[in-house]
Amino acid sequence: MTDVRWRRVRTPFGDPSDEFCEGRLDGRRVVFLPRHGRGHRLAPSELNFRANIWGLKSLGVEWVVSVAAVGSMKEKIEPRHLVIPEQFFDATKRRVSSFFGDGIVAHVGMAEPVCPDLATALEKAARQTPATVHRGGTYICIEGPQFSTRAESQVYRSWGVDVIGMTSMPEAKLAREAELCYATLALATDYDVWHQTHEAVSVETVVQNLQKNVASAKDVLRRLIPLLGPPRTCECPRLLANAVITSPKAFPPATRKRLDLLIGRYFPKARRRD
């Protein structure tokens, strides 16, 4: 990237994982957030997902690609393969998964949690690289930070999931609420703990294969950027148009003010009353 600068962003939901890195890539403005903080200081359960997504939204980001290390739950998805999942299963336990509440209720559809346009562009970019790419499948997100027991891994496999990780939920839910196009580029590093002839997942295995995958991920992202361009024609930019069920007359002023970035364009009269 060129014209790089690190920018601190304050949000109504606390501090994001780190400062946001802004710059230009092939002439396009891009923003990067080290999700676990520089130096990997934050465990999955410690991530402030709301602040992270809010920060991206406030900086004008429209497309979010979540790069994530995952374990493979299918024989055909080998370590160092790339996966672009189309479904998520949220098995987390301790994470706040919505911007809404405190007097304003919204229900955003999650039947198709991944933006199809972004996923298609991501697949096109990935297939231009030497990496093996799998499009589709389900990512199960567990709480962590521990890896699965063998019994848990076998149960997840019986559910038909394809990869397992610790970070894409509630990230995908919050991206939908923020009307951002969202997709995950999953980097397979291991076979979790279910495989009979491969070692059980360990930090050493994850780090070794992740380092090898990083070059592939960077290559994919470089090829992806030119494929994205306004206007967005998917449903993502208007997901909140009919999602807020609370009457505007009942909006608590403080909550309405806090959520202005998300709902201000739909409720301008409420905004002027604040």
Predicted feature residues:
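Generic non-transmembrane alpha-helical segments
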Residues: 117, 121-132, 219-227
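Non-catalytic positions within long, well-ordered alpha-helices that form the structural scaffold/packing
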Residues: 57-60, 157, 176
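Active-site/ligand-binding-proximal alpha/beta "capping" segment
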Residues: 125-162, 245
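A short, charged, Gly/Pro-tolerant segment at domain boundaries
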Residues: 233-273
